[in-house]
Amino acid sequence: MRLPKEGDFITIQSYKHDGSLHRTWRDTMVLKTTENALIGVNDHTLVTENDGRRWVTREPAIVYFHKKYWFNIIAMIRETGVSYYCNLASPYILDPEALKYIDYDLDVKVFADGEKRLLDVDEYEQHKAQMNYPTDIDYILKENVKILVEWINENKGPFSSSYINIWYKRYLELKKR
């Protein structure tokens, strides 16, 4: 399959461990693809929940997916600053239909003031029992929480203000076309 190019629009689908569709984002604009990563942007993007509810994203958000890390990162660009929502999730796959990954419930939220919070621990424990997450997945996810916190603390990749500035500026240029 050919990789999507800069300016292409793709669909993103998140699933649960049991294979059920969790959430879909329509028309994410691709900013960059490499062999292992995809950077995109959602701006007033239609999101459909598994129960059929629909909503539209409120602000531009740079999205980062990687094929080797068990997380993805959403950098929400607001007037008050950039805040982050990080999903602990399987590395993504890309097929002709969509970019797809498994959402493993745990999330890390980083507020514009730098405060960090680990979210949905109870939901993770509940789903781990219900869906029989294997021990190795549990270990990998917990190790990737550590990697993610390290990236946050070191302002690495998407957590760097220059990264956000570069990709947001590129999005604004592409949007004018």
UniProtKB/Swiss-Prot annotation:
Mg(2+) 2 binds at residues 105, 107, 120, 123. This is Nucleoside triphosphate/diphosphate phosphatase. PANTHER family: PTHR39159, UPF0374 PROTEIN YGAC. Pfam families: DUF402. Keywords: Hydrolase, Magnesium, Metal-binding. It comes from Streptococcus agalactiae serotype V (strain ATCC BAA-611 / 2603 V/R). GO terms for molecular function: magnesium ion binding; nucleoside diphosphate phosphatase activity; ribonucleoside triphosphate phosphatase activity. It is an enzyme of class 3 (hydrolase). Belongs to the Ntdp family. InterPro entries: DUF402, FomD-like_sf, Ntdp-like, SA1684. It catalyses: a ribonucleoside 5'-triphosphate + H2O = a ribonucleoside 5'-diphosphate + phosphate + H(+); a ribonucleoside 5'-diphosphate + H2O = a ribonucleoside 5'-phosphate + phosphate + H(+). Mg(2+) 1 binds at residues 87, 103, 107. Its EC number is 3.6.1.15, 3.6.1.6.
